[in-house]
């Protein structure tokens, strides 16, 4: 049985670093990859990197509603809550064996906290 891996990416910075590993996992018969995208990838301001992701021809892409917000405390906390809610919905409807996350921003912290709550190992 294939191991189901979710790779979370929210910006060009983490996607660029993980691009090769995403490609390898997606083309390895031992794994079933879901590339979970959100936040800046669909933003014109940040270059709509969603197009670059689509060009990789990843077999399974799931877009979550992580919409970039203004960087003030209240908006960031509302955004953080939205990210947790969206990640919970994803885990409720997808059986995932492990999650790959990379980043030093609050987006990945929200995803990591959700993984911990769902007992999903983080790679």
Regions found by a protein language model. Give the residues of each.
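Structural signal for hydrophobic packing residues in well-ordered secondary-structure cores
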Residues: 25-29, 57
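Active-site and donor-binding regions of nucleotide-sugar-utilizing enzymes
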Residues: 4, 8-11, 15-26, 66-123
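Conserved nucleotide-sugar phosphate-binding/catalytic loop shared by glycosyltransferases and other
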Residues: 33-76, 86
């Amino acid at each position: 049985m294939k191991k189901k891996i979710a790779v979370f990416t929210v910006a060009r910075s983490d996607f660029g670093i993980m691009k090769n590993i995403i490609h390898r996992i997606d083309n390895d018969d031992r794994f079933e990859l879901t590339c979970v995208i959100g936040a800046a990838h669909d933003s014109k301001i940040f270059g709509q990197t969603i197009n670059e992701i689509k060009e990789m021809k990843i077999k399974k892409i799931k877009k979550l509603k992580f919409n970039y917000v203004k960087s003030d405390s209240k908006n960031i906390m509302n955004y953080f809550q939205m990210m947790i809610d969206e990640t919970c919905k994803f885990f409720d409807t997808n059986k995932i064996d492990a999650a790959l996350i990379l980043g030093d921003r609050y987006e990945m912290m929200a995803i990591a906290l959700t993984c911990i709550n769902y007992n999903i190992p983080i790679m």
